[in-house]
């Protein structure tokens, strides 16, 4: 729609919560095949002390990082059991799902791994722009999506980029006047 340069080079990491790190690692490493690349405990003072920089408000939490591909990490904090309720992914401010771009071969392998582990999934579904997806939940109740674009090299942004006219057709359904960024000819 416009030629603005991206703000960043991509996602560094997503940080999610679990109350069972072993169960989480068994799923992400064993079923999905994401390598564990870093394991640490949050240093004292960074959970409840003055040095807290936004970490969960507990001390000595495990904080593990997995290689999600594309130079992106998927991280988990292990929360104390029973301290916090599970969230509702459809609430405002909560994450609805995480989608990973994978090769067609990897897509098929994960599908087989889910079946072997007796885990249900929805798909494959053609979600548009020559992209096929499957949806499933991790053991923490986090909804995941794996998407592939056939044998082609993944080019997610280019494949999903609309023309200005296509985007404006939807944007005009928003209440009120279009924001200046939507009206610009860039």
Q: Regions from the language model: what does each represent?
A:
Residues 1-4, 84-88:
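Short beta-strand/turn micro-motifs at beta-sheet edges
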Residues 1-5, 11-19, 64-70, 86-186, ...:
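Vicinal oxygen chelate
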Residues 2-7, 38-41:
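A short, N-terminal "cap"/entry segment at the start of jelly-roll beta-barrel domains
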Residues 17-73:
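Core segments of cupin and vicinal oxygen chelate
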Residues 73-76, 145-146:
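Short glycine-/small-residue motifs
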Residues 85-89, 155-158:
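A short, polar/proline- and glycine-enriched secondary-structure boundary/capping micro-motif
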């Amino acid at each position: 729609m416009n030629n603005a340069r991206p703000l960043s080079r991509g996602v560094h990491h997503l940080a999610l919560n679990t109350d069972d790190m072993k169960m989480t690692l068994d799923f992400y490493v064993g079923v999905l095949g994401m390598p564990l690349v870093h394991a640490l405990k949050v240093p004292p003072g960074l959970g409840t002390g003055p040095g807290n920089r936004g970490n969960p408000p507990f001390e000595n939490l495990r904080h593990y990082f997995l290689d999600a591909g594309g130079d992106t990490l998927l991280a988990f904090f292990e929360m104390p059991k029973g301290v916090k309720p599970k969230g509702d992914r459809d609430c405002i401010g909560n994450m609805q799902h995480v989608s990973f771009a994978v090769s067609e071969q990897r897509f098929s392998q994960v599908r087989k791994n889910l079946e072997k582990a007796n885990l249900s999934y929805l798909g494959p579904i053609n979600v548009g722009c020559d992209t096929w997806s499957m949806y499933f939940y991790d053991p923490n109740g986090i909804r995941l999506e794996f998407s592939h674009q056939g044998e082609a090299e993944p080019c997610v942004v280019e494949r999903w980029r609309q023309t200005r006219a296509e985007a404006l057709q939807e944007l005009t359904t928003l209440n009120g006047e279009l924001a200046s960024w939507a009206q610009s000819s860039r």
